[in-house]
Amino acid sequence: MNNGILLNCQNLTKDYIEGSVTTRVLKDVTFSMNDKELVAIVGSSGSGKSTLLHTLGGLDQPTSGEVFIKGKSLQKASQDELAKLRNTYLGFVYQFHHLMADFTALENVLMPMLIGNQNKTEAKDRAEKMLNAVGLSHRITHKPSALSGGERQRVAIARALVNNPALVLADEPTGNLDHKTTESIFELIQQLNEDQGIAFLLVTHDLNLAEKLNRRLIMQDGVLRPEM
């Protein structure tokens, strides 16, 4: 896509149906994001933030509307094409790190590349590089239980970066962290954005964190609007 547009969506709606009750959680959402941009979506619990993020990342399908990554429609892609788009362009970070407890930090970061059948030696080198980039080169042999909350989230960020994504979608990445650790995670995001040109779209309830990003959007009752 031209003009540096990395991600955009047009007229997204999302309905959940329980019995005879239909609840619309996304209401005609239109949004775009440029290469290398840092964007925050803020809003109260239940406003539709996480649903939007999952839909933008192709993890959930909209009821209507369309999502484009680098001009390619997620809704028109086959399952194989969708997986390739996600693996090529996107990384994901969640509030709960979802690390595998029985594996070391290095093995956790390696996993997406091994699933993608990448060369094991090259994958290991890449994983070590990413752990070094997030400041954990000295902790690569530690399992999640031996890491602090901030360290576990750094491992999760490293895992999101191993396939060299253009965009990381982060759902409350600092939600379980104290203020000091939150600050360090934000500094890491800034550094990765500046050094590697990675764009970040953060869903967060932390207004202090959101204010530090390039752009802020507000989600309220399924409607996305610019910050006033």
Curated annotation (Swiss-Prot):
SMART domains: AAA (SM00382)
Annotated positions binding ATP: G43, S44, S45, G46, S47, G48, K49, S50
Subcellular location: Cell inner membrane
InterPro entries xrefs: AAA+_ATPase, ABC_transporter-like_ATP-bd, ABC_transporter-like_CS, ABC_transpr_LolD-like, LolD_lipo_ATP-bd, MacB-like_ATP-bd, P-loop_NTPase
Keyword Protein transport: no
EC number: 7.6.2.-
Record's bilayer topology term: Peripheral membrane protein
UniProt record, GO biological process: lipoprotein localization to outer membrane; protein localization to outer membrane
GO cellular component: plasma membrane
The ABC transporter domain, residue ranges: 7-228
Major location category of this protein: membrane
UniProt keywords, alphabetically: ATP-binding, Cell inner membrane, Cell membrane, Membrane, Nucleotide-binding, Translocase, Transport
A GO MF term: ATP binding
Protein's job: Part of the ABC transporter complex LolCDE involved in the translocation of mature outer membrane-directed lipoproteins, from the inner membrane to the periplasmic chaperone, LolA. Responsible for the formation of the LolA-lipoprotein complex in an ATP-dependent manner.
NCBIfam families linked: LolD_lipo_ex
Subunit-structure text: The complex is composed of two ATP-binding proteins (LolD) and two transmembrane proteins (LolC and LolE).
Entry similarity comment: Belongs to the ABC transporter superfamily. Lipoprotein translocase (TC 3.A.1.125) family.
The protein, known as: Lipoprotein-releasing system ATP-binding protein LolD
Originating organism: Mannheimia succiniciproducens (strain KCTC 0769BP / MBEL55E)
Gene behind the chain: lolD
